[in-house]
Amino acid sequence: MSASPLKVAVTGAAGQIGYSLLFRLASGSLLGPDRPIELRLLEIEPALKALEGVVMELDDCAFPLLSGVEIGSDANKIFDGANLALLVGARPRGPGMERSDLLEANGAIFTAQGKALNEVAADDIRVGVTGNPANTNALIAMTNAPDIPRERFSALTRLDHNRAISQLAAKTGVAVTDIKKMTIWGNHSATQYPDLFHAEVKGKNAAEVVNDQAWIEEYFIPTVAKRGATIIDARGASSAASAASASVDAARSWLLGTPADDWVSMAVLSDGSYGVPEGLISSFPVTTKDGNWSIVKGLEIDEFSRGRIDKTAAELADERKAVTELGLI
């Protein structure tokens, strides 16, 4: 185990997602049993005492791969030299808050974090945004980090991707490993479009295997898109462990690459592919290699899918307009 530790910064580290995420990272779930990890944990001042308790638990696990932990409330110190930043912390949506209120509340957070990353992160930094509204938070952070290549920023739609795989596996009676080429298009919101029409079940087209357009439209798409709200209703709290697991999955795929016969969903900077306006952070089917992603090209988009992709892209454009008017980008 001679490799130098990967410096992983996590924001909102004492929160619910952070609590699930840190132990996965420290145990080697990200890069396997041979690469040590140094955790750099950012929290707001009132949460630092709770974070100290989490660090005690990390210590008590005696993880062989955990080479060190640093905590603090100063982003410039915590992000210093970071190779991977997982921006989990965000202002939660409270009762009566509209999404526009959420955009404004989180704008200041991601503006400051983008600037700090720009100043002190390592040259090979990759930034994954989990905190909602994730796509536009990623856009704000990216815009405030002009010296970091824009393709180094991504927002999390892997949770939606995993949810879609799980639902399709249950419907078709196969293992989740039998499903390939699932795609989430657009925003990590209720407008997202989980696309079965290019997915495969044991090598066969998923939509043809399902052979039930009503199920796709009336059950599959809304179940995946609104799963977070359903979990809140059942659990009394938002999905934390699954979001943490998806954050690890997404970072691992980004850093280590996708299999030759599969792709993943990542919200990345649009180059205009599939009619999604250039400059938005939108989810696409992507392949990854050597820490870089590429949007899968050449997929046929039917009329049904076109309408869904356009709808979620329009929401992203509205969010971009809102944060532009707020002076955040």
Curated annotation (Swiss-Prot):
Positions bound to NAD(+): 12-18, 106, 113, 130-132
Gene Ontology molecular function terms on file: L-malate dehydrogenase (NAD+) activity
Catalytic residues of the enzyme: 188
Listed Gene3D superfamilies: Lactate dehydrogenase/glycoside hydrolase, family 4, C-terminal, NAD(P)-binding Rossmann-like Domain
Binding locations of substrate: 93, 99, 132, 163
Disulfide bonds: none
Record keyword ATP-binding present: no
Catalytic reactions on record: (S)-malate + NAD(+) = oxaloacetate + NADH + H(+)
Function description: Catalyzes the reversible oxidation of malate to oxaloacetate.
Family named by the database record: Belongs to the LDH/MDH superfamily. MDH type 2 family.
Protein name: Malate dehydrogenase
Species per Swiss-Prot/TrEMBL record: Mycobacterium ulcerans (strain Agy99)
